[in-house]
Amino acid sequence: MSSLSTPASRPDGRGAGEPLLVLVDPAAGRADGESVRIARDVLCGGADAKVVLPESRSELDRVLSHRGRRRPVVIGSDQAVHKVLQALHRQRDLGTDPVGVVPVGPAGTVLACRALGVPEQPVAAARAVLGGAPRKLDLVVDDGGGVVITELRIGAEPRRALPSLRSLWAKQAAPDQATVPDPESTPMRVEADGRLLADVHERIRLLEARPAGGELELVIRTAGAERRLRVAALSVAGRSFGYSADGCPVGPVRHRTWTVHPGAWALLLPAG
């Protein structure tokens, strides 16, 4: 892992705001090194920024646990953001500081953060980190340690293509992640808040859940009906099924439970 610390000061001699820990996903550098360089230069020019390139999940955990007062900033894809949020959640440190994000990667790999309001261009995103305002957001956490920030989906066509760029942190943490199988070929049992919504004899065509207002907005579609409801927890069981978390494929697994954590984290977004 390499690192660079660049203290910054304003012309008037005052400090340049909150110190930052800038976490660069190595996969982002391979995908678009110029955007990474631009974002790093803007961040280092406006704050006391320590730039690190963790090369494994253990290194990511270590730098986050020793960051002190520095706010974490992710330069990378949605999947890289997932891994940082997972690490902070494991360390019970998720709500301590707002998280900054500079999305870097192919278009299909950064749509979740953009959907939350993060600017598309690296300069604008970096400026939002430096001068933006934190916005509290719900986080969906599963019993395997994964997270969802915008959308969980099983079945039907995803709203966007699955990403081809894999975060190095994700590769080290979950080498078995693959494509999402067709749920109609896999009998599944679905429960929400302890209530049975679909049993194994029903073929699920679509299950979609999004965090909203401290709950999950759930859509479940079978051959005969579609149900919409708001729940706090969702459980799915089957012989082998996959799903997408913010477009990132996960699985196959046999059981998964997702729980909403209201206002669990804060994202730095453009002020106003």
Roles of regions detected by a PLM:
Residues 1-8, 17, 140, 162-187, ...:
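A broadly tuned "polar low-complexity/structure-edge" signature
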Residues 2-8, 205-272:
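ATP/nucleoside-binding phosphotransfer catalytic cores, i.e., glycine-rich phosphate-binding loops
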Residues 2-153:
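Small-residue-rich beta-alpha loop regions that form the catalytic core of phosphotransfer
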Residues 14, 43, 66, 91-93, ...:
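A generic structural signal for short, solvent-exposed coil/turn residues
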Residues 23, 45-47, 72-74, 111-113, ...:
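N-terminal start-of-chain detector that recognizes signal peptides
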Residues 29-30, 156-157, 265-267:
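Short, acidic Gly/Pro/Ser/Thr-rich loop/turn segments
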Residues 93-217, 221-223:
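Catalytic core of DAGKc-family lipid kinases
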